[in-house]
Design a protein with these regions (language model features):
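Terminal accessory/targeting
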Residues: 1-52, 58, 66-175
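Active-site histidine-anchored catalytic micro-motif
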Residues: 63
Length: 175
């Protein structure tokens, strides 16, 4: 839902300038070619593996587009082809915290958010942390907020709170 695809073969999931369709447009489209989406997913997966030397631990598309009715078949095929066990689904039984964003990323919000989910075995906290570089500044308006999220999550208060509650931080490969 942002930027250019790796492949230049997009006829149903790209715009006239060759960019991915914006989320608001993609969610309303009914003629998205699943094979086109799958080919792009494979290209992105192969690039990821080439860059990092391993496959990712999970699949989660920008703006959760991987779980749209128009794309979910391609997502399932990709997960099976690459033996990826965890695919982020909007209707998952894993508690999903999506409101840790922008002005809601200070420590008190972090604590309040975690308290709401203490009864759950697994909780996924969506965040947008990053180290800012020129490329990110050029393609996103959500920049310094990312730094703020990072500082909140690695700060001493958050670490102490996590330790106090005996919360185990894991990653998708352990799920």
């Amino acid at each position: 839902t942002a930027g250019r695809p790796l492949l230049d073969t997009h006829k149903t999931s790209g715009d006239e300038k060759g960019n991915f369709l914006k989320n608001a447009i993609l969610t309303k489209k009914t003629d998205v070619d699943v094979e086109e989406v799958y080919a792009e997913y494979v290209a992105q997966m192969e690039k990821y593996i080439k860059l990092f030397g391993h496959k990712p631990t999970h699949i989660d598309g920008h703006h959760h587009t991987h779980a749209l009715p128009q794309t979910i078949e391609a997502t399932r095929r990709l997960a099976k082809a690459y033996d990826i066990k965890y695919v982020r689904h909007v209707d998952s039984d894993v508690a999903f915290i999506s409101d840790f964003y922008g002005p809601l990323t200070d420590y008190s919000q972090f604590e309040t958010t975690l308290k709401r989910h203490l009864d759950r075995e697994y909780v996924e906290l969506m965040c947008h942390v990053a180290f800012i570089d020129v490329d990110l500044i050029q393609c996103s308006t959500y920049n310094f907020d990312r730094v703020h999220e990072l500082e909140t999550l690695i700060g001493s208060q958050a670490k102490a709170y996590i330790a106090e509650l005996k919360i185990e931080l894991t990653h998708f490969a352990s799920y």
